[in-house]
Amino acid sequence: MSTSVFNRRWAALLLEALTRHGVRHICIAPGSRSTPLTLAAAANPSLVCHTHFDERGLGHLALGLAKASTEPVAVIVTSGTAVANLYPALIEAGLTGERLILLTADRPPELIDCGANQAIRQQGLFASHPTLSVNLPRPTPDISARWLVSTLDSAMAQLQHGALHINCPFAEPLYGGDEQQYADWSASLGDWWQDCHPWLRQTCYPPSLYQPPAQQADWFFWRQKRGVVIAGRMGAQEGRQLTAWAAMLGWPLIGDVLSQTGQPLPCADLWLAHPRAQETLAQAQMVLQFGSSLTSKRLLQWQTACQPQEYWLVDSAPGRLDPANHRGRRIICPVGEWLSRHPAQRRTPWATELAAYSESAQAQVIETLAGQFSEAAVAHQLAELLPDNGQLFVGNSLIVRLIDALGQLPAGYPVYSNRGASGIDGLLSTAAGVQRATAKPTLAIVGDLSALYDLNALALLRQSSAPMVLLVINNNGGQIFSLLPTPEAERQRFYCMPQDVNFEHAAVMFSLGYARPNSWPQLRELAHQCWLRGGTTLIEVQVPPSQGAETLQQLVQQVTLIPQVAP
């Protein structure tokens, strides 16, 4: 009897079981040991197959698909170091909640630790980072199909947040054989193959997941007090809902760039440095934080130092999510559901002077950046480049901080990022996944080192189903280190690491459009044409190396000198 045929039957059942739990997208890297899984995925009509030759980028492609679709996404890789390359995306998913199913092909047990080629210890490789791990046995007809499908159903039913690692050993041969063999093994599941439901419909009942969020009994008391709302990472609908809710309460809302609230008090990273603004905020009796992953340095400093009578943090993700370790309440539930069960009461705003400080800070930004074509100016005016009915992917390091501090994005406009572990690896791949999941026009903005780090992901951008612009802000190195007290003598060589490159030839290599504008009107017109023309265009903006960091530091100092506003 054929080992290769049974491997494929085993893999076909595995993939079909995953589709019963909402898996539609599967990302596949080349490899021989993973052949049973790859062929099963290709043959399954319920799956959309994505391919990439780099497993690190493949993991991030899946991460982007999961972010934008809010569905579980599967990944197939071969054995050996291919598996280890999934680590960064797995870590990010664990911190930000995207559901990934990592199907890692493996050598059978007798080939581990004996010098066999491409055989490493894959069981437990990811340590505590996966939410769940399943180590499957080598496929054999001695194990019933019911056991395999029940094992997978149980694991998928438990997967609410983060990654599931399924290690899949396969013995050779991997190719050929009579496809009619072992049909009775698959047929033992009867009419399940014609069904669309899991074999085992397991229901999980952790309270925060199956019950609507219980109303805080004292909410009607606290909503009459002076409160401040902090908005971290959340969805577009939640951002709009929170903005209206806070406005009705009369509570100031300090919105992160990822909050999608429209940042009703823009330039918070600047005006939060003003002593009088801090004095006003100190009068808050309650702070309500929705979402995590705050970007602004000044907001994080205030969030750490504030001492309200009550501090509540609402987010659907598990964990504490509060590095300041406030005494208060950690409420695990979706933001929108919590808001619906805790109605606002219309009240007169109690901290109106904050709006004046915000307006003054924004005016200072406009005055300082007038006539500039710079990193800071692009961050400030980024909203003008956004496509209608599109989405934005924001990179890490300096650019996200500049957009957070100087820009103001439209309320409810979809914004994606990798702000869990905040690495610069895999950003282009993640942006490609976001675009593929939604087929919306997409603007992605990253720095030059981020683009270099994931350069081969430009291959993924060739397959764009909607217009896409990759905006690379080339400040020649990791200029975020110019914001930090790094030793000046060693800063360039050991921290910023300038590479003195441009991206024109990279765009040509991957058959992408390319442009390098020299002014803001030119950039704005280029972006507009890209949305009309379609395809993917890499737009490179070359700027003086440390100007963005220096401008931000200068603006913080200028805003602290704004005259006091009368309450």
Swiss-Prot record:
Gene3D superfamilies for this protein: 3.40.50.970, TPP-binding domain
Cofactor binding note: Binds 1 thiamine pyrophosphate per subunit.
GO terms, molecular function: 2-succinyl-5-enolpyruvyl-6-hydroxy-3-cyclohexene-1-carboxylic-acid synthase activity; magnesium ion binding; manganese ion binding; thiamine pyrophosphate binding
Keywords associated with the record: Magnesium, Manganese, Menaquinone biosynthesis, Metal-binding, Thiamine pyrophosphate, Transferase
GO biological process terms on file: menaquinone biosynthetic process
Tagged with keyword Cell membrane: no
CDD domains registered for this protein in UniProt: TPP_PYR_MenD, TPP_SHCHC_synthase
Pathway involvement of the protein, from the record: Quinol/quinone metabolism; 1,4-dihydroxy-2-naphthoate biosynthesis; 1,4-dihydroxy-2-naphthoate from chorismate: step 2/7; Quinol/quinone metabolism; menaquinone biosynthesis
Reactions accelerated catalytically: isochorismate + 2-oxoglutarate + H(+) = 5-enolpyruvoyl-6-hydroxy-2-succinyl-cyclohex-3-ene-1-carboxylate + CO2
Listed EC numbers: 2.2.1.9
InterPro entries xref list: MenaQ_synth_MenD, MenD_middle, THDP-binding, Thiamin_PyroP_enz_TPP-bd_dom, TPP_enzyme_TPP-bd
Subunit structure: Homodimer.
Biological role stated in the UniProt entry: Catalyzes the thiamine diphosphate-dependent decarboxylation of 2-oxoglutarate and the subsequent addition of the resulting succinic semialdehyde-thiamine pyrophosphate anion to isochorismate to yield 2-succinyl-5-enolpyruvyl-6-hydroxy-3-cyclohexene-1-carboxylate (SEPHCHC).
Family (UniProt): Belongs to the TPP enzyme family. MenD subfamily.
Protein name: 2-succinyl-5-enolpyruvyl-6-hydroxy-3-cyclohexene-1-carboxylate synthase
Lineage summary: Bacteria, Pseudomonadati, Pseudomonadota, Gammaproteobacteria, Enterobacterales
